[in-house]
Design a protein with these regions (language model features):
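Bacterial N-terminal signal peptides that target proteins for export
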Residues: 1-11
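Bacterial N-terminal signal peptides
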Residues: 9-20
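Acidic, small-residue rich beta-repeat scaffolds with periodic aromatic anchors
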Residues: 19-35, 108, 116-228
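Beta-strand-rich domains and repeat architectures in extracellular enzymes and scaffolds
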Residues: 30-61
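Short glycine/acidic-enriched loop and turn motifs that connect beta-strands
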Residues: 55-58, 102-105, 183-187
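Surface loop/turn motifs at the tips and blade-to-blade linkers of beta-strand repeat domains
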Residues: 77-81
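Residue-level detector of Asp-centered blade-edge/turn motifs that repeat once per structural unit
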Residues: 91-92
Length: 228
């Protein structure tokens, strides 16, 4: 048998084996059990987000999040210790936001988009990290004490009606409204301070950029005003 042919055949078999293993891995491991309480469905009914937990011998939880579409599962990374998550779809069912508690007083946001293979990460970093970095570049952030703990990012309710409930008239499934909060650790000069309390910005899903609409001016001024 020709050596080149043999090498090619072995390589092809190896690649097929790897592909088969990868295909088999596209589902939760046997020790992860679904918790139906946290299952959610997209507005068009085509995608279901399922949450699976693995419980260690010590009672510690590790959560995985899977999007099921046409009987195909895709993992919504990363997995999370201790806490289940909340999920919201845009009204066109093509974008998915994960609202993730990560600790006492801490919360992050992850953004996923619908692609040919199902839902995948839409940003290289968590959406909450990008929003926090945007806030730090804003001039108003230089007027306050910098939050250093209890950092929380939340998705403001309104994706289901494109924020018309907030009085907005934006294009369908175009924007997300994000709320940021954070505290300053106590020291010898002051106690624990909530220096940011629900500051809002808007994320453009088409452009991948942030801005602050004029309508947010009043609520944002209150969000960073000194506590009385």
């Amino acid at each position: 048998m020709n050596r080149n042919y043999l090498a090619s055949s072995i390589g092809l078999l190896f690649a097929c084996a790897i592909g088969a293993v990868a295909a088999q891995a596209a589902e939760p491991a046997a020790d992860y059990k679904i918790n139906p309480e946290y299952t959610s469905t997209s507005p068009d009914g085509a995608t279901t987000v399922e949450q699976y937990a693995r419980i260690s011998a010590d009672g510690d939880y590790t959560w995985q999040f899977w999007a099921r579409r046409q009987d195909k599962l895709t993992l919504l990374k990363p997995e999370q210790p201790d806490y289940a998550a909340g999920f919201r779809f845009t009204s066109d069912s093509r974008w998915l936001v994960r609202m993730q508690k990560t600790g006492a007083g801490y919360a992050s946001l992850y953004l996923y988009r619908l692609g040919p293979q199902g839902f995948v990460a839409a940003t290289a970093k968590p959406l909450s990290d990008l929003a926090g970095a945007y806030f730090k570049r804003r001039p108003e952030s230089r007027k306050i004490r910098k939050p250093d703990f209890h950092i929380e990012a939340g998705l403001v309710k309104g994706t289901d009606d494109n924020y018309r409930s907030l009085g907005q008239d934006w294009p369908d499934s175009r924007y997300l409204v994000i709320s940021l909060s954070g505290e300053v650790s106590p020291n010898s000069r002051h106690g624990q301070l909530r220096s940011v309390r629900g500051w809002r910005c808007r994320y453009d899903l088409q452009k991948g950029t942030f801005d602050v609409p004029p309508d947010f001016a009043e609520i944002n001024a209150k969000a960073i005003a000194p506590e009385r």
